[in-house]
């Protein structure tokens, strides 16, 4: 099973407490989270920790990826220094445990 980018955006919004499932996410909040999702994915591809498609995130990667994106997005919402930053390393460590040798060859970084 997998989750979509929209589901990841909602998970990050809930993690940062800037979104509640019973309300619609504002376009501004969505745009700020989406920017962090794009940057996190690019970084993880470069570090060979991303082996999934942009809109087909393996279910087992959802929590670590949420932690990573929240760590990158927290400053955009005035949440720096509240512990979210630790999620980046924690999430990367979890993704490294999840990947298999065949996973890491699926996506390659784009050359500059």
What are these regions (language model features)?
Residues 1-58, 103-112:
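Conserved short "hinge" loops at termini or chain/domain junctions
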């Amino acid at each position: 099973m997998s989750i979509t980018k929209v589901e990841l955006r909602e998970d990050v919004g809930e993690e940062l407490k800037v979104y509640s499932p019973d309300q619609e996410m504002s376009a501004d909040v969505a745009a700020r989270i989406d920017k962090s999702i794009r940057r996190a994915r690019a970084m993880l591809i470069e570090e060979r920790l991303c082996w999934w498609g942009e809109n087909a995130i393996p279910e087992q990667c959802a929590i670590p990826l949420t932690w990573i994106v929240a760590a990158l997005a927290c400053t955009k919402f005035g949440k720096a220094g509240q512990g979210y930053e630790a999620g980046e390393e924690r999430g990367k460590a979890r993704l490294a445990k999840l990947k298999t040798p065949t996973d890491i060859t699926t996506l390659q970084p784009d050359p500059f």
